[in-house]
Amino acid sequence: MSTTEPAAPVAPLDITATEEWAALTTHLREISEVSLRDLFAADPRRGETFAAEADGLYLDYSKNRLTARTVELLTALARRAGLADRIEAMFRGERINVTENRPVLHVALRAPAGTRIEVDGVDVVPDVHRVLDAMSQFADRVRSGDWLGATGERIRTVVNIGIGGSDLGPAMAYDALRDYADRSIEVRFVSNVDPTDIWEATADLDPASTLFIVSSKTFTTLETISNARAARSWLTGLLGEDAVSRHFVAVSTNAEKVAEFGIDTVNMFEFWDWVGGRYSVDCAIGLSLMIAIGPPNFREFLAGFAAMDTHFRTAPFERNLPVLLGLIGLWYRDFFGTATHAVLPYSHYLGRFPAYLQQLDMESNGKSVDLTGRPVSTPTGPIVWGTPGTNGQHAYYQLLHQGTTIVPADFIGFVRPNHPGVGTADGAGVDQHALLLANFLAQTEALAFGRTAAEVAAEGVTPDLVAHRTFPGNRPSNTLLAQKLTPFALGQLIALYEHKVFTQGVIWGINSFDQWGVELGKVLAGRIIPELGSEQEPELGHDSSTNALIKRLRAG
């Protein structure tokens, strides 16, 4: 049960000073010269042994530079860090976000009805389902044509206005689940304060058939409210002030500000301060997604999250997908010294998934002090990046295979396609999805095992080209495989990475649920805005570079 008092920071444990860390350091020296070729040659069943599964989501982590002893030592490190207790603390609604004195309960957003999760002694799950029901009713009205615009037109376009978690999550999920969307309603997303964004989003729209969803917890976020005002001006300039109530709804906690804007608070869908922005796609922030794919599919999406939540909470660490991914990532970040992590989905629909994970991971674990404010003693969150396969193969895979930087990677694939493809890929009866999967598998194999100089020479390559066509291999990767990209599978994947990030944050002893690093830029921007716009020459008090740039911008 949560209390109003902040949870005491988990023991300010210097994880690098533990016996478990020392054992891993010693083990690294033992394994550093062992290649993946050696490991697979020594164990013909390695590909089956180093694998785990949860509700149809399969993880093959055999192509990593680790052994059973590595997994044993890493899981011991997780236990030493108190991971099991921290998992329970989160699910119990304790205020584990200690810098903001808040519970962290995105898991409540997808908890089945009847589950009990308390904040300050109050079960929050009924409230979650009340909002879900309200969202469902509204989404059904829009989809059926019962909700009409001010002139009696059906809604044909929904424009979601938000930024950060209010944009990245729903935009990613909308793209991912387009195969399940009602194609008679288009959803667009506006986030950038650059006026080009809102201009392009509305340039070809009919205001009479456009619905805006303004998503902002406080309804004061600079970029979001600026874009919302621009959208309001565009709409009222064509339809009049009275049209606002039929063409704007809000996702917020600030009813007063919503009403001031002109949105009827009956059409405000709430969420709670125990929901972080980057963990909010499965609450009212996902209203645009629910309108697109329909309430039943949205609830399947939530069911995927919930299944992974249960797995994370109950599975032994040795078979726990989020824990394994977190520990493997930490193994490379802290012991091998890798700085980046690639996420490579072999699905065109998951084009925005790496960008979504950038916020989830880098905003959560991009921290340099621990829970007590002391400098951390080891590197924390990696740089996360990636694009869909096979496009990336023709861009940066060259560096992955033959560059001097080791980049651990997650490959994500699906057994069955959402679309079968037209004709065959090569004229020999191989369809496009099989071609995609062949590349998906080939890349992990090539990264792991490479090609030796002797193998290249044996193919008849001229001696002057042998070095250029040799692949060092020993490049690590995980393979994630689901049957098909469905709402359930997407929910699983998102929750998998949420809990991976949490696992790493616990071991590093940092707060994965605040984001103070975004604040300073906002404060300084607040100073600069009037300096750029004032009629009188302002007295500038910045550094010489910023002062000179402001003067150049003012000069036009």
Curated annotation (Swiss-Prot):
State the UniProt keywords alphabetically. Cytoplasm, Gluconeogenesis, Glycolysis, Isomerase
Q: What class of enzyme is it?
A: isomerase
Q: What GO cellular component is one of the record's annotations? A: cytosol
Q: Which GO terms describe its molecular function?
A: carbohydrate derivative binding; glucose-6-phosphate isomerase activity; monosaccharide binding
Q: Does the keyword Cytoplasm apply?
A: yes
Compartments in which it is found? Cytoplasm
PROSITE patterns found in the cross-reference section: P_GLUCOSE_ISOMERASE_2 (PS00174), P_GLUCOSE_ISOMERASE_3 (PS51463)
Q: Name one Pfam family in it.
A: PGI
Q: Which domain of life is it from?
A: Bacteria
Q: Name one GO biological process term.
A: glucose 6-phosphate metabolic process
Instruction: Report the active site residues.
Output: 363, 394, 522
Q: What does this protein do?
A: Catalyzes the reversible isomerization of glucose-6-phosphate to fructose-6-phosphate.
Q: Which HAMAP family match?
A: G6P_isomerase
Record's protein name: Glucose-6-phosphate isomerase
Source organism:
Frankia casuarinae (strain DSM 45818 / CECT 9043 / HFP020203 / CcI3)
